[in-house]
Structure formats: structure tokens, C-alpha cells
Amino acid sequence: MVSGNNVTDRPQGPDSYARIALSLADQGWCVTPDFLAPRLIGELIGEAERIWNAGGFRHAGVGRDPDLHINPEVRTDHVRWLVPQAGSDAQRLYLHALEELRQAINRELYLGLFEFEGHLAIYTPGSYYRKHLDQFRGIGLRTVTCILYLNRDWVAEDGGQLRLYTDPDEPSRYEEILPLGGQLVTFLSARFLHEVLPARRQRISITGWFRQHGGLNI
């Protein structure tokens, strides 16, 4: 169990949140190493592995109710949605850090973000997620994507990179981001196509979105 009284367990502070917000305002995306302390990442990894071993994940779908369906040509990962009221101490510390980040982004970008929704995601060897946007067609509620990686000792040979297409006018221009444990990736959900390349070992993350009430265009 993680205690927030231990300074080594605490997430990065206000300066880090402000840097992320400024990067979103400047280029629309940001990569933050060591967003959470290693001990806290270890707790989250252990939780995800226990839930997986107990059969608590399900195949991820494409679309949103009532159009949600399984499409292995698009994605083959497994997910378990977070329930904040029933979350562990480690999850609550992470969600508290995201709340601080939400406020910092609202101060800088005036986006009116009001809540976070997210899930644990596990990619088994060979799993992938093809190129896509995080906003559903005609529904602009998901506004800022946040991905926290929960992987030990990841190297390029393990695959599973996040490929973020950083220029809509240049499809060949992209960043490939290794899913390093403790690293947080944030980007504007409506702006950037992205994909997860096939993983060669189990790959774990918490993926989620800050949402708006009315789906403003940004």
C-alpha cells in the first residue's frame, strides 16, 4: 500500500503541471518522464497484473455505446475501466495528480475541462491499436488525452511504441514514444492521430481523457 505521507511517493508538483500545460498550449502535446515516483508505479503495475490474472480485463471495443463493437482489425488490447470511488490508494494518488493537472491546463488554455475518465490497458505480445483519433465522430467531449505507462525496463526491441503524428499536413512526420514506466504523455485529443505499434511483451498503461461538458472545438 502506498502512503501519500511519504514524499518519495508524491507526484510531480505545480511546476511540472504548469510545464505540461504550456507545452499543450505551444505544440499540443507533451512527454513527461517520471511523472509518478517509482514506488507508486510499482504499486500500479502490481494492481494491474493482479486484476489481469483474476480475469478482470475485457477485450477493448471500438466506438461508443450503442455503437461499441469488437474489431480486431483496429485494436487488440484489453481494458478495465477505473472506478474512482472504488480505487486503490495508488490510483487515488494518481487521480489527485491529474486533478492538479486539469486545473493547470484550464488556467493556461481555458478549455473548461471538468472530469477525467480512464481505464487500465494491457497489450499482450502481438497486440496493437491502429491509427485513430481519440474523439468519437460528432462527439467532442474527450479533449486532452493522458497516458501513464506502467512498464518495467522497457527497451526499443520490446516494440509497443506510441506513434504520434505531430503534423496533420505531413503524414510522414511523427514521434515514436517508448512506453517507459512512470512516463506521462498528454496531447489534444482531436488534433493528433496516433497508434500503438505491436508489442513484443506485455505492455501496461492507464489511458484516459479530460472531458468537456459541450465538446468545444480546439
Tell where the protein language model's regions lie, with residue ranges:
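Fe(II)/2-oxoglutarate oxygenase catalytic core
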Residues: 1-145, 149-184, 190-218
